[in-house]
Amino acid sequence: MSKPPTFVPPACARAERLVTERGEFAVLDARPAGAVRGTALLVPGYTGSKEDFIALLEPLAAAGFRVVAVDGRGQYETPGPADEAAYARPELAEDVLAQAAAVRGTGRVHLLGHSLGGQIARAAVLRDAEPFRSLTLLSSGPAEVSGEQQQRIELLTAAMAAMNMGQVWDAIQAMATPEELAEPDEDGTRAEAALRARWLLHSPAQLTATGRQLRTEPDLVAELAACGLPTQVVSGERDDTWPVELMDDMARRLEADRVVIPGAEHSPNTDNPADTARALAGFWSAHA
């Protein structure tokens, strides 16, 4: 789970509802003060939300990019149905295509997905690459997650079947290590209340369906490479969801731009947002 430094967007961003042909999605829409060099759509990961990218918005807008971070269906402030079928991978991919259509205007969109969001973004590109100028896979591997993470997802799925979301949150916090607990917010308060509020709005059906996808995702790297879309693979220096070496190999197979963010683990977007934003802006500028 990414832990954003705050849930309050910067002055350059507005919290809005993005209207698409597949419904409305909660977004943070950050815009540059001057000319727009490109538009990027950011897709969050498992248990995440648009706020996971909040520390990237200001530096990317300052670099000239409009950045739209989205809550997928069933994530935080985008409601979703209780039917797991609504969160099948093709459905989520179509959502991304609809979001891209709503923000792209006359140009194409830089697409970024973090963790699970990277695999959803990949599925969208495989369905239709035309709306996209580039793809960034941020801490998102080629296939299923590590064995340890599969076990954690299985435990979470079982807990959601037996308890309500508040009880599940309390159990997660009770088992967390000190390093996994929420850090103080930028204003000195604990971020735990905001993280808990986000968790309570997640759809259990979404978490169950996408958790299953993370445990069973096939390797589609060859298919993605065949699309010919400029691709960037970004990770931290270590990652317990997909080993860094696995992402190195994926980048080679994709002939992708490869960036390792110093001091970061599974969430470079929150662990080291300055270097992450710099890497993204450089890649997007090269493929404007």
Regions found by a protein language model. Name each.
Residues 270-282:
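Post-His helix in hydrolase/transferase enzymes
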Residues 122, 126, 132-163:
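Flexible "cap/lid" loop of the alpha/beta hydrolase fold
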Residues 113, 117, 121:
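Gly/Ala-rich beta-loop-alpha elbow adjacent to hydrolase catalytic centers
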Residues 26-80:
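Conserved HGGG/HGGXW glycine-rich cap/lid loop of the alpha/beta-hydrolase fold
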Residues 21, 62, 68-112, 278:
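Active-site loop/oxyanion-hole signature of alpha/beta-hydrolase fold enzymes
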Residues 1-40, 62-65, 201, 285-288:
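Alpha/beta-hydrolase fold catalytic core
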Residues 145-151, 165-225:
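Conserved alpha/beta-hydrolase catalytic His-Asp/Glu region
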Residues 226-264, 270:
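Conserved loop-alpha-helix segment in the C-terminal half of the alpha/beta-hydrolase fold
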